[in-house]
From Swiss-Prot:
This is Type IV major fimbrial protein FimA. It is a single-pass membrane protein. The pili are polar flexible filaments of about 5.4 nanometers diameter and 2.5 micrometers average length; they consist of only a single polypeptide chain arranged in a helical configuration of five subunits per turn in the assembled pilus. Belongs to the N-Me-Phe pilin family. GO terms for cellular component: membrane; pilus. Disulfide bonds join 63-105. It comes from Dichelobacter nodosus (Bacteroides nodosus).
Length: 160
């Protein structure tokens, strides 16, 4: 009388492990890129928050206002987020009048200087995203950006 075999053979288990390993080899790098892109997107949110400050400073004809002085209530030129630090920079160019022209004001986001500490993706730590403000108030990625192109949010990618 034959005995019935129950369960999986060793070769079947090895095949399943190999398939899982192959899938993981593709999924883990894609997941790491996804995390880095989502963390880099915070920089654009920080820059959007600085738009009001830039607009207030432009009333005085400059991009940067006076440095932060909490005693006098003056709002500073930077904003710290979870994954990065955004700073207003640049020199206002009043001669630019077309909506799509850069007005000279910039926001420089440095990743890895936020409140998250070492919980930021290594793919963007220490990288910079420099956003040029256009006359119409929107931003595009500008010169000085060393963040990899695939991590730059679509909202600020320059049209090619």
């Amino acid at each position: 009388m034959k005995s019935l075999q129950k369960g999986f053979t060793l070769i079947e288990l090895m095949i399943v492990v190999a398939i899982i390993g192959i899938l993981a080899a593709f999924a883990i790098p894609a997941y790491n890129d996804y995390i880095a892109r989502s963390q880099a997107a915070e920089g654009v949110s920080l820059a959007d928050g600085l738009k009001v400050r830039i607009a207030e400073n432009l009333q005085d004809g400059e991009c940067k206002g006076p440095d932060a002085n909490t005693a006098s209530g003056v709002v500073g030129n930077e904003d710290k987020g979870k994954y990065g630090l955004a700073k207003i920079d640049g020199e206002y160019d009043a001669s630019k009048t077309e909506a799509g022209d850069p007005n000279g004001c910039k926001v420089e986001i440095t990743y890895g200087q936020g409140t998250a500490g070492d919980k930021i993706s290594k793919l963007i730590t220490g990288k910079k995203l420099v956003l040029d403000q256009l006359v119409n108030g929107s931003f595009i990625a500008g010169d000085g950006t060393d963040l990899a192109d695939k991590f730059i949010p679509n909202a600020v990618k320059a049209k090619k």
